[in-house]
Regions:
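Non-heme Fe(II)/2-oxoglutarate
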Residues: 2-92, 231-240, 244, 256, ...
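Catalytic micro-motifs at enzyme active sites that drive phosphoryl/nucleotidyl and oxygen chemistry
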Residues: 9-11, 114-119, 176-177, 201-203
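Residues that flank catalytic or metal-binding motifs in active/ligand-binding sites
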Residues: 20, 102, 113, 124-128, ...
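Signature of the catalytic double-stranded beta-helix
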Residues: 57-113, 117-123, 132-141, 299
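A contiguous pocket-lining binding segment that forms or flanks enzyme active sites
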Residues: 127-132, 326
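Charge-biased low-complexity segments
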Residues: 168-177, 184-328
Length: 328
């Protein structure tokens, strides 16, 4: 919906529904090639005996997880891992409002390996998967040697199945689950509150040709600052305004998830733009409450109205302040 903030003179775009996953193709593509080359170098000759090959945990939890995994930092070394971590942290701060990531795993899937549906909320508000799987098919896609291996995420509307039930609709897997192919260099960030997993891999038993991914969680949402304004410059303005805003938000109907607002601040200190960088805000449905769309509008418009009215100290250049708001 498009809500007009009359006081600030801005139009604030508020989506009707949250966005629980996002796909970024070509994420650190050159560096991803470097990481893949390290892996290929160590697996090229299966007859070679080398300590670097003896690093995998065969993780099997009956009826839940079956895969090969290893800590990415141990596998790639501190320098390469540091570059990977830097790229992920930069993306996490800018787009997801998160200041840290968990230690990254690297996992390999060959024939019969999979992850059944699960939800792992405590680790962080966003999970991620970065694919190093080869695009080795004739058409340039992945999967010349196997089928399956997609990230699968349950569509949020199916969690309220009867509310959205349509007796005239045929419901098949694509209406229940979102499946995302492990294309090389593809970063998938998603809301781990939704049941998710990895579809079973069929085909190759050769780890050189299996599903290879890096994965972990973005965590620790907190404000970030870039440009002329520092945290110390902006904190006095933010502390007063956010205290009042939080007091109003607790009076609104309950919701779960997070939204993150990126503010563009002009050199004179005025806020000139607000962009929602991520949004998983999901109202808690109760019969006596307004519609979920109305609740989302109320919460996000309240946030936007408060932020667009802010006036920061003047500086000699533009700034961007990214503010996450978490609801439980």
């Amino acid at each position: 919906t498009n809500e007009d903030d009359a006081d600030a003179g801005f139009d604030v775009e508020i989506a009707e529904k949250p966005t629980h996953w996002r796909v970024v193709d070509g994420f650190v593509s050159d560096f991803a090639n470097d990481l893949r080359a390290v892996y290929d170098g160590r697996t090229r000759d299966p007859l070679r005996v080398d300590p670097e090959r003896f690093v995998w945990d065969y993780w099997h939890v009956p009826n839940q997880y079956t895969l090969l995994r290893t800590p990415a930092e141990d596998y790639f070394g501190a320098e390469r891992y540091g570059e990977l971590e830097k790229a992920l942290l930069e993306y996490g701060r800018r787009e997801l409002g998160c200041s840290a990531i968990t230690p990254v795993w690297m996992s390999c899937y060959v024939h019969g390996m999979r992850q059944e549906l699960h939800a792992d909320v405590p680790h962080g508000p966003w999970a991620f998967v970065l694919s190093l799987t080869k695009n080795d098919a004739e058409d340039g896609s992945y999967g010349a040697h196997f089928r399956g291996g997609e990230t699968q995420i349950m569509r949020p509307e199916r969690l309220n199945y009867w509310k959205n039930f349509d007796a005239g609709e045929v419901v098949e897997r694509s209406q229940i689950m979102e499946t995302i192919a492990p294309t090389f260099g593809r970063l998938v960030a998603f809301d781990p509150r939704l049941p998710h997993g990895v579809t079973e891999v069929f085909g190759t038993q050769d780890p050189r040709h299996g599903r290879l991914v890096l994965h972990g969680w973005f965590k620790d949402p907190e404000p970030s600052f870039s440009g002329a304004l520092t945290e110390e410059d902006a904190s006095p303005t933010l502390e007063g305004a956010l205290g009042e805003l939080y007091g109003r938000l607790v009076e609104l109907p309950r919701a779960s998830g997070m939204v993150c607002a990126a503010l563009t601040v002009a050199p004179d200190g005025a806020v000139t733009n607000l962009r929602w960088t991520c949004d998983t805000l999901t109202p808690i449905p109760l019969p006596e409450l307004p519609s979920e769309t109305d609740i989302r509008d109320a919460i996000m418009l309240d946030i936007a109205s408060a932020l667009l009215e802010l006036k920061f100290p003047a500086r000699d250049a533009e700034s961007v302040i990214t503010l996450p708001f978490c609801f439980e």
